[in-house]
Design a protein with these regions (language model features):
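Structural signature of Gram-negative outer-membrane beta-barrels, strongest in the C-terminal barrel
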Residues: 115, 129-133, 137-141, 154, ...
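C-terminal beta-signal and adjacent terminal beta-strands/loops
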Residues: 518-580, 606-684
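Short loop/turn motifs that connect adjacent beta-strands in outer-membrane beta-barrel proteins
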Residues: 123-131, 227, 307-309, 383-385, ...
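Face-selective signature of the C-terminal outer-membrane beta-barrel domain
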Residues: 1-248, 305, 387-388, 442
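Flexible, surface-exposed loop regions and adjacent strand-edge segments
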Residues: 3-19, 148-159, 246-263, 328-337, ...
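Gram-negative outer-membrane beta-barrel transporters
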Residues: 224, 385, 390-402, 411-530
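Extracellular loop and loop/strand-boundary signature of outer-membrane beta-barrel proteins
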Residues: 103-108, 117, 121, 156-158, ...
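Residues on the lipid-exposed face of transmembrane beta-strands in outer-membrane beta-barrel proteins
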Residues: 118-124, 134, 217-223, 236, ...
């Protein structure tokens, strides 16, 4: 708090922060100006001149090389948190400001759950060839979410205020008339206990619950004949969610005051009491609105037994699913507001009348729809057995939530995406072959194509209520835009998965196996903020203008043909020039070297039978035997866009997308190196 960010991978601590568009993605000096001519000047330290022509690197390349070497050599002081420095900062702060907040501390984020479940099933076989089943499943759960101080790192206490809100108060005060007391309220994490001094173990920041109920009523008929099996089932699901909070957040109070007609969306049913300064007593909670959903599902399937060793199976399903709480509440740490589709669902009749839509359209608008089908052929012979499956699934009206620091607004924002359609299709095959008495060879192949099949609709709002834009009448509003994701791959892991396993089993209960796996077509998760329609066209879907879009960079990043016409990809998205295309293109995670796409695992074990049906099982497993630490298991684009201020007579203080496209590099997850597991089990 009020101190430098200690994270080693914070962008200001990375080598990429030191250069200004003159290093390519492989760390090589580009050596060209943006108009393509050779650059021969000296380091001027300015980056851009007034007419927008690039004139050279803004840093000494030796400094960049030195920092890069520290990272690649895994220097502890560079790649790890300097804990000694954090303690030293807190000790100095204790001496200078003993009643103030510690500079650094370690917090613990709690995400606990309590749940209970009831299952009732009834089965009837009184009709020949028919098994009829009905069931009821009910589940109640409560998600408990809060933060606590884990370690003060030598500090005296932590003052529970929001640093982002405290910094942004000057901007907030311009939105509505605010007294000094009002301004101080905004930064409080709990208005009922302002400026609380929190010590080790104390709760801070947020403390809320999500209460969820879920009940399923279903019925299924299964028909079984000599050559054909048939089933069909129908299910209705009721679900509800409701947020309560033990803290009255100052940003929620501010947003309710800023939007009095929608105050209950931020503070729940007690909004007016809170705005009047009547905060809940200790031990009491602010209760948000309950949201209720009813979702139907239907499935049907059949099996055709060609003969005793070959058969075909086909399945189909259609259903709707209410959003999960994590995809419904925009910023539950701060306020009670949910995505817009849920309020349309809650008041379906009113919205249908207002917009001329159907009641069913509004009621099911918040639920994701899904339809799927699959076909499987399987075989089973004495020496070989296996199956091959083709599948196709279509999703409609999905929801995603994102939060990030916006460099243009200079505050933390929440982004809610709705109307997301996806298609998952592919083929899976598996076979096992016996190789003599002791060995079995098993192969598995899965090839999928998981893509987004529509663009999304985005609503972006500042968590602290800051005005992100103004309409023609000067009124503040949230940013509404399309997100151009149609055709992107869904980041669900590798879409090509293959493995070959050789297994050994001895009658004296020794067993071992070695598995070689190959993975491909793995993609980085996209950042919606980098693919907003307004960034490509200069105008958002809501009609507002964008300050600093891709066509308003120093060199106009939009790719054009020889006739000056904008070039589009096959999904209608304008193409960008290098290096700006690095900001929006989806990256494949697969390593360039083929051998880095393999993982090898081995295991060996022994089962020992004892007297009186007792036994001991010993199993040793070695994962990633070849220690392949270059294997990327996932990752994501950072949502932040590099911004810089274009200087000049006509462009003074005009914010544009900067040329240092590697300023906020993507984050990656890597496979663990070689690791061992020894499992010993005693059964009695």
């Amino acid at each position: 708090y009020n101190a430098p960010d200690p994270r080693p991978d914070y962008y200001r601590n990375m080598p990429s922060f030191l250069y200004d568009g003159q290093i390519d993605k492989n760390g090589n000096f580009i050596g060209k100006t943006w108009n393509g001519s050779d650059w021969t000047g000296s380091s001027l330290g300015t980056g851009f001149n007034y007419n927008g022509t690039y004139v050279g690197p803004s840093v000494d390349m030796s400094t960049y090389s030195t920092l890069t070497d520290l990272w690649t050599s895994r220097d502890d002081k560079t790649t790890q948190i300097d804990w000694d420095a954090l303690y030293a900062a807190n000790y100095a702060n204790n001496a200078n400001n003993p009643e103030g907040s510690a500079r650094y501390m370690v917090e613990r984020r709690h995400n606990d759950i309590q749940e209970g479940m009831l299952n009732i099933n009834y089965r009837n076989t009184s009709v020949d060839h028919l098994t009829a089943t009905v069931g009821l499943e009910a589940k109640g759960s409560q998600g408990i979410h809060y933060k606590s101080v884990d370690d003060l790192l030598g500090g005296n206490q932590w003052i529970d205020v929001d640093p982002f809100a405290e910094r942004d108060i000057k901007e907030l005060a311009t939105n509505i008339g605010m007294t000094q007391e009002d301004i101080n309220n905004v930064k409080q994490n709990n208005l009922a206990n302002p400026n609380a001094a929190i010590t080790t173990g104390g709760r801070l920041g947020y403390d809320y619950r999500i209460n969820m109920m879920n009940a399923k009523l279903w019925a299924q008929n299964e028909w079984n004949w000599n050559e054909v099996d048939l089933y069909y089932a129908l299910q209705f699901t009721y679900s509800s969610m409701q947020r309560t909070t033990n803290m009255v957040n100052g940003r929620a109070w501010y947003l309710a005051r800023l939007n009095p007609d929608y105050a209950q969306y931020y503070l729940g049913s007690q909004a007016q009491n809170v705005l009047d300064g009547n905060y809940p007593a200790a031990g009491s909670a602010l209760v948000g609105y309950a949201h209720h959903f009813i979702d139907p599902a239907f499935k049907i399937g059949a099996t055709y037994k060609i003969n005793g060793r070959n058969q075909l199976k086909v399945n189909a399903m259609a259903e709707t699913k209410a959003p999960l709480a994590r995809d419904a509440y925009i910023s539950p740490r701060v306020h009670d507001r949910a995505i817009e589709a849920i309020y349309r669902h809650d008041q379906a009749a009113a919205y249908a009348k207002r917009d001329g839509t159907s009641w069913l359209h509004e009621y099911f608008g918040a639920s994701q729809k899904m339809a799927s089908a699959d076909l499987t052929y399987s075989f089973n012979y004495p020496v070989v057995r296996g199956r091959i499956t083709g599948f196709y699934t279509q999703f409609w009206d999905g929801t995603e939530l994102n939060g990030y620091y916006d460099d243009e607004a200079r505050t933390f924002v929440n982004q809610a995406l709705t109307g997301i359609d996806r298609r998952h299709m592919g083929i899976e095959a598996a076979a096992a072959v016996k190789l003599g008495l002791y060995f079995t060879l098993t192969g598995v192949v899965s090839v999928g194509d998981y893509r987004y099949t529509s663009n999304a609709y985005s609503i972006t709002s500042a968590e602290n209520g800051m005005a992100l834009a103004e309409n023609a009448d000067g009124a503040i509003y949230e940013l509404r835009d399309s997100v151009l994701i149609n055709g992107l791959r869904v980041a669900t892991g590798p879409q090509v998965n293959t493995s070959l396993k050789l297994s050994f089993f001895h009658p004296k209960m020794w067993f071992a196996d070695i598995t070689v796996s190959y993975f491909d077509w793995s993609y980085l998760d996209y950042a919606p903020s980098r693919r907003m329609k307004g960034l490509y066209t200069g105008v958002r879907a809501d009609g507002s203008a964008v300050n600093g879009w891709y066509g308003d960079t120093y060199t106009n990043a939009i790719q054009k043909d020889e006739n000056g016409e904008v070039m589009y990809d096959k999904y209608g998205v304008p193409q960008l020039k290098y290096p700006y295309n690095m900001l929006s293109e989806q990256e494949m995670l697969t390593d360039n070297q083929w051998y880095n796409r393999f993982l090898v695992d081995v295991s060996i074990g022994k089962l020992i039978y004892l007297k009186n049906r007792q036994s001991i099982s010993i199993n040793l497993t070695v994962n990633n035997l070849l220690n392949n630490t270059r294997f990327k298991t996932g990752g994501y684009q950072q949502a932040r866009l590099p911004r810089q201020t274009r200087q000049g007579v006509e462009d003074s203080q005009n914010s544009v997308i900067g040329s240092n496209v590697w300023k906020f590099p993507s984050k990656y997850y890597y496979a663990w190196g070689t690791n061992f597991y020894l499992n010993i089990q005693y059964k009695f």
